[in-house]
Amino acid sequence: MSKFLSQAALNTLRNTRLGSRQLVRSFAGIASTRNHREPAHQEPGCGQALGRGLLQMRLPVAGRRSMFIQTQDTPNPDSLKFLPGVDVLGKGNTYDFPNGTTAHSSPLAKLLFRVEGVKGVFFGADFVTISKQEGAEWSLIKPEVFAVIMDFFASGLPVLHDAQPNADTEILEDDDETVMMIKELLDTRIRPTVQEDGGDIVFMGYEAGVVKLKMQGSCSSCPSSIVTLKNGVQNMLQFYIPEVESVEQVFDEADRMIDSEFERFEKNLKTLKQQEPSGAGPH
């Protein structure tokens, strides 16, 4: 997830003001991805031509004869990005489901959490990011996720019951100039890059020179998320906004409590399963 900005890059950005999105992305150094391939399902040369694995299923989706699902690695080894080739939430929209109890607003998220080993689900404009539990195998999870996504989009059901656009970077009447500039940079320059890695970054507040941000999707548990904040996001914000002294990652306490309860529940289930073979027979 690391995104580094050199001094030369910053000088170029200064000369071009905010510059183009492509320019900023190139300076941010989008993390390279390793290809996931599904040899049994590919036409010869498809993976090489597209730079990532393709799975083709003969299933009618939105008037199409076939649905192509691409899988793309993220900088987080426990998160994988699925691109169904159709809009998921539409341009600029994201929605995070850090655990199963938060999936009540999405029929698709509910189905994905039923797949054994799935820990988190994240929806982007045209992708779904799946985060797996530690120790779970992608070779077992991927086929089930493929099936769920294809069946769901074939059904024509809405992804969300009440789809709402991101509001954290919406300019409010009481926002001062510094906050407005922070929101603008996050929304137009930083978030698009983070979303390409299968996650998102949410503005949680600004106080006394400190910008508070929340990482979502593949970024939430990525080992290099702190490096991303300090060497990428913080550098860019400080360059354009001198008032910014530092960037801090914040966590949702409610999510932490739910995650803790889930981990405890899973440990209890594993303990029970391990005890079953040595347990007493039927009475």
From Swiss-Prot:
Binding site for [4Fe-4S] cluster: C219, C222
Name used for this protein in its record: NFU1 iron-sulfur cluster scaffold homolog, mitochondrial
InterPro entries on file: FSCA_dom_sf (IPR034904), Nfu/NifU_N (IPR014824), Nfu/NifU_N_sf (IPR036498), NIF_FeS_clus_asmbl_NifU_C (IPR001075), RNA-helicase_DEAD-box_CS (IPR000629)
Predominant localisation class: mitochondrion
Keywords (A to Z) from UniProt: Iron, Iron-sulfur, Metal-binding, Mitochondrion, Transit peptide
Taxonomic source organism: Drosophila erecta (Fruit fly)
Family: Belongs to the NifU family.
Keyword Metal-binding: yes
Transit peptide: 1-30
GO process terms (BP): iron-sulfur cluster assembly
Region described as NifU: 182-250
Role noted for this protein: Molecular scaffold for [Fe-S] cluster assembly of mitochondrial iron-sulfur proteins.
Keyword DNA-binding tagged: no
Compartment(s) of residence: Mitochondrion
Assigned GO CC terms: mitochondrion
An annotated Gene Ontology molecular function: iron ion binding
Residues in coiled coil: none
A Pfam family assignment: Nfu_N
Intrachain S-S bonds: none
